[in-house]
């Protein structure tokens, strides 16, 4: 009861809109496809009109191609609007933001998976809707957000930030893995015994399951869901998690800019969050429109992932009529291999985020691993001696002596395949 009280108190103070949205999602999950698409059209028309009136970026873009908000009469008219690229978002961040006095906004930042991090303001209504969508997905598995849970996500090694993280985790009945070293890992596995769900980066969940199986550690028996997000879930991941947890990894697909795009139901189908987003598939690539966020409009956003949509005729035995994503093919999560230990690739995000946050040093980067225990950091500009020293300090903070590395500035950062990746590994295990 304590954790429920703390959760509801914090939720209602931070996100006053969320209760109403949870009730709405409970009702709308029973809607027909036709009713869902009628709602989507209404929200799209509102979004386009609002963006045209309050965002200089969208007004200029629409005027340049002679498109007026009144031209959007059906969902098919979405293709009249220009595509928004990641480059557009990073270059025109200020102009995309709307000039409107929202009562409450939150600062949001992307993970910088392409080597560049975006920071923008998300209005309270959109933030609440996104959180409501996650809670609603958990309800399909009889999970409450305040249930004890293991978290495979980010953390920061600075003393103050680590204390803050531990405190917030305690209040949210949450614990997280801070490393794969024996003592820390064993303590984490002990806590898993009483957890109701675990969630986070799929590659970290896989690594944990693999170690539990290899070390023949006690297997959790109370878990109701293992949820992976932000990375592609390979079948070999599920082979290990079924052995370790008795469950496959359930997929939650989304992005900071778009909000939750899809959530996998207990029948194994990834239903699109049609109340929150519009999804298009163009040449197997996803374009997403965030229907709920007005503070920083995201319309026809080229997310950079490759997907396969199911036929509109496909019906799920769970009874929901929301359209289905058959597969997300573009998100691949890799581990970093030291001489002795294995690390999550999100360490790179924190290394460069810390440089920006603490020293105002912004670097466009790509990290290459061809051999275990060795990393190549490629930077696309000249870096000063003091910047290099600070970068070395951050790298050592996360990897210590377990990794040898070189830093090459003025590098040409290349894409691997069609999608630019901030970490490329030649090691596959």
Where are these regions (language model features)?
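Short, hinge-like loop/turn segments at secondary-structure boundaries
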Residues: 167-168, 216-218, 267-271
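Adenylate-forming
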Residues: 179-183, 195-236, 251-256
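AMP-binding/adenylate-forming
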Residues: 128, 132, 136, 148-204
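AMP-binding/adenylate-forming catalytic core of the ANL superfamily
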Residues: 198, 301-399
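Short, structured coil segments at secondary-structure junctions
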Residues: 170, 222, 244-248
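Nucleotide 5′-phosphate-binding alpha/beta core
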Residues: 1-109, 115-148, 155, 197-199, ...
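Conserved AMP-binding/adenylate-forming
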Residues: 233-314
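General small-molecule cofactor/ligand-binding pocket signal
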Residues: 175-178, 250-252, 404-409
């Amino acid at each position: 009861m304590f954790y429920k009280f703390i959760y509801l108190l914090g939720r209602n103070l931070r996100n006053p809109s969320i209760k109403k949205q949870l009730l709405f999602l409970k009702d709308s999950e029973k809607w027909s496809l036709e009713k869902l698409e009628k709602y989507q059209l209404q929200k799209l028309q509102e979004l386009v009109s609002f963006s045209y009136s309050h965002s200089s970026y969208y007004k200029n873009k629409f005027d340049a191609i002679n498109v007026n908000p009144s031209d959007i009469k059906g969902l098919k008219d979405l293709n009249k609007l220009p595509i928004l690229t990641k480059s557009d978002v990073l270059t025109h961040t200020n102009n995309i933001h709307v000039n409107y006095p929202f009562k409450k906004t939150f600062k949001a930042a992307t993970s910088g998976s392409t080597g560049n991090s975006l920071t923008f303001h998300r209005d309270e209504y959109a933030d609440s809707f996104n959180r409501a969508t996650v809670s609603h997905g958990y309800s399909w598995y009889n999970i409450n957000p305040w249930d004890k849970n293991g978290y495979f996500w980010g953390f920061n090694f600075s003393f103050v930030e680590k204390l803050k993280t531990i405190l917030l985790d305690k209040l949210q009945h949450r614990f997280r893995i801070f490393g794969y070293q024996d003592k820390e890992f064993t303590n984490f596995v002990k806590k898993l015994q009483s957890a109701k769900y675990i969630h986070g980066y799929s590659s970290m969940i896989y690594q944990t399951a693999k170690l539990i199986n290899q070390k023949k550690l006690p297997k959790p028996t109370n878990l109701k869901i293992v949820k992976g997000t932000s990375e592609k879930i390979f079948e070999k991941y599920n082979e290990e998690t079924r052995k370790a947890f008795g469950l496959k990894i359930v997929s939650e697909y989304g992005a900071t800019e778009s909000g939750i795009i899809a959530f996998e139901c207990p029948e194994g189908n990834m239903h699109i969050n049609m109340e929150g987003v519009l999804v298009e598939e163009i040449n197997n690539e996803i374009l997403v429109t965030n229907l709920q966020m007005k503070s920083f409009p995201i319309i026809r956003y080229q997310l950079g992932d490759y997907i396969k949509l199911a036929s509109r005729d496909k019906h799920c035995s769970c009874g929901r009529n929301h359209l289905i994503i058959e597969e997300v093919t573009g998100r691949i999560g890799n581990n970093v291999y030291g001489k002795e230990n294995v690390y999550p690739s999100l360490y790179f995000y924190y290394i460069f985020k810390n440089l920006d946050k603490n020293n105002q040093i912004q670097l466009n980067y790509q990290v290459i691993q061809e051999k275990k225990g060795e990393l190549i950091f490629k930077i696309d500009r000249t870096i000063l001696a003091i910047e290099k020293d600070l970068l070395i300090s951050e790298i050592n903070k996360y990897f210590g002596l377990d990794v040898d590395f070189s830093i090459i500035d003025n590098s040409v950062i290349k894409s691997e395949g069609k999608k630019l990746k901030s970490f490329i590994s030649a090691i596959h295990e």
